[in-house]
């Protein structure tokens, strides 16, 4: 009989630990070489900044490569769009690191905005335009108008303090699904893209693992050169290897898709880029506004806001900072809205969001310095103006970028799981909220994406394309679905007793709910130039 015996009611005898203790809970990671406020020496900081620039180039190039041909543009338009997105990303990264969250977060393009942007591209009012260049400009101006209106949502929600009040209800438990799927949820941009040219992508991921995980254990030294600069080493080697395959005629008789993925001379960016060009506002003409498209883009802006909140949290972990107070996250969201506004004004063709891959790079290098990311922003602006030189680096084959994503997205996902250390995993309430939100965060978007792939339109299919996007796009985001579900369940299923608060991990995060309740918050997140006196955080 189970649990029978002796009148003890099945109570197990106390276990002998023999000196075994659980790992200590840490609100700051101690194994980071340079934290948010401690910059490396200048030569090392410049190389690390260039490495961040290389990593963010992937998304910066892939998004225009996908969108521009459908807009009617050619290599010249694609090069200009890449330059503009790069230029605005540099500005946004500087603004975020100086006045926003002050975290070492790179602000770049986002895949979240792509479906709604594609809906604008396919709008019927552009189908009668025969001149490809005129069609490109007209569509770009429509995208600009939608982005300008969408930016208002993040600006108002962030600077009004509304997002601060929402984030105060966020616990470590509800943050886990959001942060974890902000990384793991991007798996389709990893190996599936890498496999389009396996002979280039596979060597890249193998070399990246060797340089970052194995060689440092074989060759021990104080400088930690190999794991800190693993991206530069591996990308240069595979890039040369891919170029040798290209000039050697390895892809001469292959299909178009293989040549596009594998060859180093197929991007068209070098030939399409001018030597020197400074992007400027309204370069494509005055923006046009369409109410439905603006509402659809605002819905996407809200999804991006939630995804970015999760990424900010994991960036703070990898920068060895304390959890950002709600007022700091709200401030960051407001400046991110300014970033979306700049994307609309300059005509970047995409919105601004926190770069998940660069967040993963912080974990790989174990350098969370704010100065490094500011240097990378300098590289973005510099190479966006010197078009030809920037295009050389931007011609890295997409499978090489995908190999980097495999590692960096995994780091971000693992950073989300690490928040479980604050929670009680023996609680069935914790198990339910965690398991259900993660499962549904994978299952619901899978249904929406699979339905769209088969039918060429989403489950919500009305005559109003903008309304379809307002429903279909949010439910196609894994981090959004998981984060919203976990947040809702955690808040509505909570009781006021201290045991439940402890299970949720709030005992650990309570001290960071107010800016002044922990002295480290002022060290990491106070505004520069004594601006805290005029814009105090609460």
UniProtKB/Swiss-Prot annotation:
Of the GO CC terms on this record, one is: plasmodesma
Where does the secretion signal sit in this chain? none
| Cell compartments where the protein resides | Cell membrane
Q: Where is the composition biased (Gly residues)?
A: 1-11
Print the keywords alphabetically.
Cell membrane, Membrane, Transmembrane, Transmembrane helix, Transport
Q: Where are the transmembrane segments?
A: 45-65, 81-101, 103-123, 143-163, 166-186, 191-211, 229-249, 295-315, 372-394, 398-420, 432-452, 471-491
Show the segment(s) annotated as Disordered.
1-20
Q: Name one Pfam family in it.
A: Xan_ur_permease
What topology does it adopt in the membrane?
A: Multi-pass membrane protein
Top-level taxon of origin: Eukaryota
An example of a GO molecular function for this protein is: transmembrane transporter activity
Q: Does the keyword Transmembrane helix apply?
A: yes
Q: Does the keyword Transport apply?
A: yes
Please list the tissues where expression of this protein has been recorded.
Expressed exclusively in ovules.
Entry similarity comment:
Belongs to the nucleobase:cation symporter-2 (NCS2) (TC 2.A.40) family.
Listed name of the protein: Nucleobase-ascorbate transporter 7
Q: What is the primary gene name for this protein?
A: NAT7
